[in-house]
Design a protein with these regions (language model features):
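Basic, glycine/lysine-rich polyanion-binding surfaces/domains
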Residues: 1-215
Length: 215
C-alpha cells in the first residue's frame, strides 16, 4: 500500500434543485447513469467544447425532497479557474457551490492491499463497494466520518479520503506506523502513465475536444 497527499486537488460541493441537469450542460457524460453512492469520470468543457479540465463527479443523493448534492474533484492546476467557471454557470441556475476542502486534506491509499487496510481501519465490510463507489466511513481514532471513494489516479485499486486537517495528520501517522509507504507526485505520474490515464495540460487542453483526446 502506498499513500499520497493530494490535498492540492480542488473539491467542490454543488447543492440545489436538479444539480445533475444543471451540471450536465458543462459535461459530455450522462450524469443520470449514476445514482447515490456512485461516481463517474468526465471532462469539464468550455463554450467551444474544448476541455477545461478532467474531474470526477460523485452523486451524494438527496438532501431533502427538493434538493440534491454532487461533489466534484478537480485538478490542482485548474482549481481556481474551474471553480470560477462552475460558479458562473451554476449559481444563476440556483445552485450553491462550496469549496469543501478549504480547511481539509485529501489522501489517497493505493495498491492491491489498500481496500483491505481501509476495511481494518473502519471495521466495515467494503467488499461490496464497487470501483467509483463512495460512502462515509468512521475510521478508528478519528473525530469525524470520512468521505471515502474507491477511486484513484494510479491504475491500482484503492481509495481517496476527504477529511479535516487534524484527522488527516492523525491518519497519516497511523498509516506510517502500519508501514504504509508515503509516495510523491513523481511516483503517481509514473503509475498513471503506465495505466494510460490522461494528464490535463499534457495529453489534452482547452483546444482539445473529448473525441480528439480519446475520451
Amino acid at each position: 500500500v502506498g499513500m499520497f497527499d493530494i490535498s492540492d486537488m480542488g473539491v467542490l460541493r454543488l447543492e440545489g434543485s436538479n444539480p445533475k441537469d444543471a451540471l450536465q450542460r458543462l459535461l459530455p457524460s450522462d450524469l443520470h447513469r449514476i445514482g447515490p453512492g456512485e461516481a463517474c469520470y468526465s471532462v469539464l468543457l468550455n463554450e467551444r467544447g474544448g476541455i477545461r479540465d478532467d474531474l470526477i463527479v460523485y452523486d451524494c443523493g438527496a438532501i431533502d425532497a427538493e434538493r440534491g448534492a454532487l461533489v466534484l474533484v478537480i485538478n490542482a492546476a485548474c482549481a481556481d479557474s474551474d471553480t470560477a467557471w462552475i460558479r458562473e454557470q451554476m449559481e444563476p441556475a440556483g445552485l450553491t457551490v462550496t469549496d469543501i476542502k478549504k480547511d481539509g486534506v485529501l489522501l489517497a491509499l493505493q495498491g492491491p492491499e489498500a481496500m483491505g487496510l481501509l476495511q481494518e481501519l473502519s471495521g466495515e465490510d467494503l467488499s461490496g463497494l464497487p470501483r467509483f463507489g463512495h460512502r462515509m466511513l468512521q475510521l478508528e481514532g478519528l473525530s469525524q466520518p470520512v468521505f471515502s471513494a474507491r477511486t484513484g489516479y494510479t491504475g491500482e485499486d484503492g481509495a481517496e479520503l476527504l477529511l479535516n486537517a487534524d484527522d488527516g495528520q492523525k491518519l497519516w501517522q497511523r498509516l506510517l506506523d502500519r508501514g504504509v509507504t508515503p509516495c510523491g507526485l513523481g511516483a503517481r505520474d509514473t503509475l498513471r502513465l503506465e495505466a494510460a490515464m490522461h494528464l490535463y495540460g499534457q495529453d489534452m487542453n482547452d483546444k482539445t475536444n473529448p473525441f480528439e483526446a480519446g475520451l
